[in-house]
Amino acid sequence: MLEPRPRVFFLFVSCLDDLIGTDHEALLSALGARHPEIAFRMCHMNPISLGSRTPPPVSIQNNLYSLLAPSEKRDEGINAIGNLEPTAVTSELYHFLSAYGVSRLRHISQYETLNAYQEMAGSRANLVIGAPGRQAAGQMEERLGIPWIFMPVTYDMEEIEDNYRRLKAFLFPDREEACDWGPARERALQAIRRAVKKAGRFPIIIDASAASQPFGMAKALLTYGFSVVRVEAQDCMAFDKPHMEWLREHHPEVELHQPEHHRAVLFDRRMENSLAIGVEGAYLAGSRHVADLFNDSGMFGFDGVCRLMRLIEEAAEQETDLGQLINGYGLVV
């Protein structure tokens, strides 16, 4: 018997359980009846469901936020949903929220107990930064009455400004403008100029493990003066499709590949002199220079542009031990 007693118990099952028809609802019902003090949740680590409405990343988000109970209290806090890591404290997003009186941008990683976690149920709105959190946010709106807005990470300066206008209209429609984006925008422009000067000579490869909008990142970097030559993405999310179409129209020379295509194992697309953003594209190309970014970690707004530029500069300055990087991620290749 576990001591102290857990409040929540997540059961992870593989595709085998789904294929043999395991009755998970019956299992959850039996466990709940035997241990009513514990909330049981079933998570499916099933690659077969990747093309379904609830692939594993979405299912996990749904289960996590289903633990929040309706709250009688409502404060000015905002929840960040879907992003695996909290937005970096250097982001101007905090300055934006603070200018309108919001002192807390809550993220699930900030909580150590279930009781403390319930604080998120009292927030006034959900900012969905990671796409897998959209379904959970919709469920939270139905159960908890928390409205939400989807704003995936972008590295395009114009899109960033537009996102902040959308966010202001969503959160504070009746308030006067309280933020000056000039300084944050100028910092991003300076970071871009430095990075282009240092890394502009490298052919750049972008993959979907690094960013939720790899085609959008490619568009932004090409606009800034970088030499993007390849995008590796198994699928293109609907919100990233306009960027992919832009690439096809304006830069048809950029290669678009699927990393899980059966020909990928031939390794006939090696480009060792490239600078890869993301470990998947780096592995397939054998890149000697790698900007180690995973899932837009901590990125948002103009600060996200600055941080991406620093990663590119650092990658240009030194070669990467690709084997060590892959082992560090615990990837199976």
Where are these regions (language model features)?
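An N-terminal assembly and electron-transfer interface module characteristic of large anaerobic redox
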Residues: 1-333
